[in-house]
Structure formats: structure tokens, C-alpha cells
Amino acid sequence: MKKIAVIGTGYVGLVSGTCFAEIGNKVVCCDIDESKIRSLKNGVIPIYEPGLADLVEKNVLDQRLTFTNDIPSAIRASDIIYIAVGTPMSKTGEADLTYVKAAAKTIGEHLNGYKVIVNKSTVPVGTGKLVQSIVQKASKGRYSFDVVSNPEFLREGSAIHDTMNMERAVIGSTSHKAAAIIEELHQPFHAPVIKTNLESAEMIKYAANAFLATKISFINDIANICERVGADVSKVADGVGLDSRIGRKFLKAGIGFGGSCFPKDTTALLQIAKSAGYPFKLIEAVIETNEKQRVHIVDKLLTVMGSVKGRTISVLGLAFKPNTNDVRSAPALDIIPMLQQLGAHVKAYDPIAIPEASAILGEQVEYYTDVYAAMEDTDACLILTDWPEVKEMELVKVKTLLKQPVIIDGRNLFSLEEMQAAGYIYHSIGRPAVRGTEPSDKYFPGLPLEELAKDLGSVNL
């Protein structure tokens, strides 16, 4: 059994700490945020993640998991210290290491013996050595320690499963002793272990996320071409993805990636490349495609409706993906303001992310936790998040709620055949449009194309 302190009780810290406790370690999760620790002690989990609340409760009852604001005491009582604080994107696009530096300084000031200090946060190449120098200076060389990079690869919405069934453990360190300690810690996960130096471990996380983001932007560019040549991107993706060299994952066309990782990490990697004097044109294009994809779905809506001024639009999905309340870089946070700039009123649905989204979007949006209520008496519907409740909508019922049977689907949830049979005007991503049983100009008198371009050109992304 290892004694572990996890500094930072955000998404990564809380999930990692809880899973380390689950495999039999003594874990204390600590944070400077007193209200967050108070909530955790009272059994209130600050993030939504399937299975996390039950696992926290179980390990608290088994006395393997505790929470505290007393970070110095947690440091002194532990053998392994994980840094799992936020690394938000700075104004220049680089990762902001303010919290990492502060954690390293605190660790150095309270060392009382040999410790293994582990960076779990996603950090730029060179951060491990920076942490090492900060701890060394703050501790005044009184005690020995080692620094390890051990990046996380969990996905929001399936983080517990991803941690307990991890596909690999990456351990970066110049110390064989420290690497062996962290490798032993990961043995119960039965995952392949990759041992390397600090720099390579730090780069692995960025490279992995950038590659996945590249697959998403690639299939979205293919989807946009498919729309112009009459191809169906879902069939194209199937045909491409069955090639074992490529794989089917992350080849689902849509409105682009969001969340706390891909947008931040692709931008940070671009800055790392620039700092190293390398023009990373591929990642520049990945980011550009992702940003344009959000405008593309609004363009589709304008193509059907001519104008949304004075119209009410229902938006289904505020979280960046299902099974999370995370709205960081969520498509909805860009698309809803675009609709408002174009003069539309928005009724938005999300089962769990309304508190987080409303704090950003404000009170000009009507919010609903009932998917049907969000669509009642609206002129068109935009699907932005593939929540199960959206996938399972009764299309016959939806048609009675909408003023016009118009659905713009950013997640390709429905087959073209069922939408045609149900009589919808249905536009999705990278697939032929369904015109419905009535021409769209029955509902929307068309505007000249130059007017559509003028409307869309006025939108600020």
C-alpha cells in the first residue's frame, strides 16, 4: 500500500486519486479551494462522471480516501505526490503553469524525506525539469526527491473505466528508483508500461491528443467534400475505418471537437512547435477546420431558413459530449451566440450541464432539462450533443412540437431514410440533405445567396 497525496481535486485529480484508492492505496486529495473540499467531505462531487460518486463514497467508507485543505500535512504524510492541477490555456495559446509552479513550490517547502513527485497534469515539454528546479530551490536541498511524468489518457464520460482498464501507463523519469515505484503502483491495472525520459512522456500526451484531433478534423473536411459531390461520409468513414491501419474510432463527422483537452492541447502543441522553431502547418489546419465546422452548421440553418431573425431555435446539447457536465470549448458556446447575433431566440436543452452553460451564456437563453419542452413552438432544431435522450426522441412527437419540421443535425444521429419517411427537412454533416414531403420555401421564403453570405459574415466566432 502506497501513501499518496493528490494536489488538485479537479477532473483528473479526483478520478485518479479515487482509482488509486480503489486498488488499495491510502490517498489524500487536497486542494486550496475550501468550499470544494467541504463539499467532497459532505459527499457532494463537484463534477459529473458516471460511477465516480459511488466509488468516492465506497473508498471514503473504507478509509482509503480522504480530503483536506491542509496541503503541507498531506505532503509530509505521503510517499508519492501527484500534481493534478489545472493548466489552462493562456492568452498566447500556451499552457499556463501558474498552478503547477505553486504546487511545486509548496512541495519543496514541506519535504520531510524522500518523495516521488509526479506530474499528472498535461504540461509542455520541459515542465518536469522546471518542477525539479522549483522543488530543489524551495527545499534548499535538504532532502532527496525525484520527478516523474505520468500523463493521463482518460475520457470524460468513461473516466473510471478508462483508468481501471487503462491501455498503457507512461512513466517518464531519469531515476530508475522513481520509475520502479510508479510502475509498481500501476501493477494492479495490468496495463503495458512505457518507461522513458521526462521529455518523451510529456510529448506523448500532446502527440496522442493532437493525432485524435487530426482524425476528427480530417473526417470533417472529407464530410464537407462529400456534401459537394453527393457522397455519404458515414459510408466513407466505414470504408476507411475498416482498414486495420486506420481504425474506425474518431472518424465520426460532426461539428468538431471541444472539451478540456483537444482544443487546449492542439493549441499548446502548436506553441511548443513554434518555440522549437518548427512551423507545424498540419495542426494549424486541424484547428482552423475545427473552428470553421461550427460556422458550417449555422450556414446549413441559414440555407434552409433564409434568415433566423425573429425566429426561435431549439438547441439540443450544451455539454461538449454526452455523460459529462463539462462545457469547456463546447460547440454550443460558440453556436448559440452566433444565432443570437443573427437575431434568433434560443431554447436550449441539456440534462445536466445547464448550471455550467448558463454561467457563460447568461439569461438570454431559455434552458430546459426536458428535450421535448425545449422544442415546443420553435422554428427549427439544432442537434449539438448526442445525448441518449436526443437519440431516442420520438420523431412523430417532435414533428407536432416544431412549427416547421426542420432539424439540422450536427451529430448525424438519424438515418436519412427515417427522416425522409417522417417528412422532415433534415440536414446533417457530410450526407445528402432530406427535403421532406414539402418544399422548404413553403415555410421559409428564400433570401438571395448574397444576403445569406452577408448574414453569416456578420457572425463573430
From Swiss-Prot:
The keyword Nucleotide-binding does not apply. Induction: By phosphate starvation, via the PhoP/PhoR two-component regulatory system. GO terms for cellular component: cytoplasm. NAD(+) binds at residues 3-20, 31, 36, 122, 156, 264, 328. This is UDP-glucose 6-dehydrogenase TuaD. The active site is at residue 261. The gene is tuaD. It is an enzyme of class 1 (oxidoreductase).
